[in-house]
Swiss-Prot record:
It catalyses: nicotinate beta-D-ribonucleotide + ATP + H(+) = deamido-NAD(+) + diphosphate. Catalyzes the reversible adenylation of nicotinate mononucleotide (NaMN) to nicotinic acid adenine dinucleotide (NaAD). One of its GO terms (molecular function) is nicotinate-nucleotide adenylyltransferase activity. The keyword Transcription regulation does not apply. Belongs to the NadD family. Its EC number is 2.7.7.18. It is an enzyme of class 2 (transferase). It comes from Shouchella clausii (strain KSM-K16) (Alkalihalobacillus clausii). It comes from the Bacteria. This is Probable nicotinate-nucleotide adenylyltransferase. Gene3D superfamilies: HUPs.
Amino acid sequence: MKRIGLFGGTFDPPHLGHLLIAQEALTAVKLDEVWFVPVSTPPHKERAGLTSGKDRYDMVKAALVQEERFRVCDIELIRKGKSYTIDTVRELKQTYPDDEFFFLIGGDMVNMLPEWRGIDELKQLVTFVAFNRPGASAKSQPDVHFVPFVEVNISSSLIRERLAKGKPIRYFVTPAVEQLIEERNLYGDNNE
């Protein structure tokens, strides 16, 4: 039986903050692996211009090459349409019935959990692990494991903004992700 962390997100693009959270999850919750799960269409975020699923998958895969306990899972990209966590977890539990799943979320998402589709069933299928930033105001919940986490002020939207302005993104993403963005010109003209 493996202890597997599921880390869902748009990963548009994946950045070092994502990797730091996954690394912290390995030790804080004693996980065997962390699976990055790029969403097809996030139900809670409407953003025009979402980079293609293939490009986001490739960027995540490129970002993970240094850590053998990280992998990318394309289950939601294959399914297409809106990505609901309950559907993903049901499918994974069916495929991997002996494994224990932990769902990684930001502390800011904890207060929104009651609004998630199928949340009562989901709480039976996974353990939620929330990464709390210092000073965050997430309500303590008995069915959520909180992990204190130093805030890393990197976001995918900040990286896209920097690229749009022709600013470098080195030290925000891995070199492999930076190279892929440049080769495919994923976010418009970028110089570095």
